[in-house]
Amino acid sequence: MGQKVTGGIKTVDMRDPTYRPLKQELQGLDYCKPTRLDLLLDMPPVSYDVQLLHSWNNNDRSLNVFVKEDDKLIFHRHPVAQSTDAIRGKVGYTRGLHVWQITWAMRQRGTHAVVGVATADAPLHSVGYTTLVGNNHESWGWDLGRNRLYHDGKNQPSKTYPAFLEPDETFIVPDSFLVALDMDDGTLSFIVDGQYMGVAFRGLKGKKLYPVVSAVWGHCEIRMRYLNGLDPEPLPLMDLCRRSVRLALGKGRLGEIHALPLPASLKAYLLYQ
């Protein structure tokens, strides 16, 4: 679970007022998932074949990494010293809302572990150990160890993320978390343990952006699993109604839908069947 560390370890629950920002300028930040994102996360994930279409691109990578033959959702980094290496996903997004899961073991992150998005022109290799994603104006990245956001890092200062952190606090990012790219609103956000961390980057509209990570840890393996996407059209009323019913039931009771006095077709609809 995502944790905030000061002198000891505390569990972060974004719904708990204890962890709302203390700084006045952060009070207006919205930590509630947008409606479209909430609906997408309630949908079943796409098939494995579709996940492969959105997976890592073995032809768009640093030479020090490769996509595994036995699991094409995972890439492996060779243990090359004084090198930072990155890889892009196969699909560049220009419209719609897209969510993918990154699985990156905490023990395999090292000093510079960065996750984000990039244009096709962003560099994928650098000599030395550096925050490669976010290093210039072609990429946007979250450094998982430093809890900092980088974009055009050579010219712009980094920002704290999640924004509720105080200067003496560290947020421990778990092995798996979600990345949400909304090309219609032009935002990049992250979800940890089901909790929306707020918008990390804005101003992305009009670009073509690819999932990207940069790594320095030898033999690290990073998995990307595309969950689903939504086109920019208005949300259908039927989908909103289904979401309302599922919310009213709660995740723990979705298995009871079969026992409800409803037509079989409606039960199937509520279960995304």
UniProtKB/Swiss-Prot annotation:
Domain (B30.2/SPRY): give its ranges.
33-231
Q: Which residues form the SOCS box domain?
A: 232-273
Q: Which CDD domains match?
A: SPRY_SOCS1-2-4 (cd12906)
InterPro entries found in the cross-reference section: B30.2/SPRY (IPR001870), B30.2/SPRY_sf (IPR043136), ConA-like_dom_sf (IPR013320), FBXO45-Fsn/SPSB_families (IPR050672), SOCS_box (IPR001496), SPRY_dom (IPR003877)
One of the record's GO cellular component terms: cytosol
Q: Extract the PANTHER family matched here.
A: SPRY DOMAIN CONTAINING SOCS BOX PROTEIN, SPRY DOMAIN-CONTAINING SOCS BOX PROTEIN 1
Family assignment? Belongs to the SPSB family.
What protein name is recorded for this chain? SPRY domain-containing SOCS box protein 1
Q: Which organism is it from?
A: Bos taurus
